[in-house]
């Protein structure tokens, strides 16, 4: 699987354009805003966009999803249904951050633990990793050893858990029980900031040590 990171919104959110090199079929993960910028990247790439994938329901990860889905005529998949209240609350999220109003969004398909997503010859595994939000999912390409982790884990940090229905202990369990076992050599693309590996975070991330700081 190939990827290109497209930073969007004032939150510098890592929207990812991912694709299968053999078929040139592609997906967008977490198009949080700046729809025109994303359209330009997709159109310049020469790829065929097939779907939009969402890790969770926060505005900075989904803000341009509806516009892009309509523009390209593609479905939206994810997150897990527990994040429905976030997607239905997008207008309130917009007002809270002083951004242009974003209408409620209902995906074409909710995702669950164990689901798979096909992009040409690429297969992504879906893992449900609650804690930052209750319906947060991540996408893992086992062959490429590449993980798109949303706001679950960052280089040197983890997602906030002080939002409605966030749970810090659940977040840490998601990381330790579901992500770290994927392997130390797995590279992850976080929702914000630089890439890292699960092995580096296992050893150095202060939130994953025995004495953990808490947001």
UniProtKB/Swiss-Prot annotation:
Its cofactor is Zn(2+). The keyword Heme does not apply. Is inhibited by Cu(2+). InterPro entries: MBL_Glyoxalase_II (IPR051453), Metallo-B-lactamas (IPR001279), RibonucZ/Hydroxyglut_hydro (IPR036866). One of its GO terms (molecular function) is hydroxyacylglutathione hydrolase activity. Binds 2 Zn(2+) ions per subunit. GO terms for cellular component: cytosol. Zn(2+) 1 binds at residues 56, 58, 132, 151. Pfam families: Lactamase_B (PF00753). Its EC number is 3.1.2.6. SUPFAM superfamilies: Metallo-hydrolase/oxidoreductase. GO terms for biological process: methylglyoxal catabolic process to D-lactate via S-lactoyl-glutathione; response to toxic substance. It catalyses: an S-(2-hydroxyacyl)glutathione + H2O = a 2-hydroxy carboxylate + glutathione + H(+); (R)-S-lactoylglutathione + H2O = (R)-lactate + glutathione + H(+). It comes from the Bacteria. Zn(2+) 2 binds at residues 60-61, 151, 192. Type II glyoxalase, isozyme of GloB, that hydrolyzes (R)-S-lactoylglutathione to (R)-lactate and glutathione. Plays a minor contribution to methylglyoxal (MG) detoxification in E.coli, compared to GloB. The two isoenzymes have additive effects and ensure maximal MG degradation. Belongs to the metallo-beta-lactamase superfamily. Glyoxalase II family. This is Hydroxyacylglutathione hydrolase GloC.
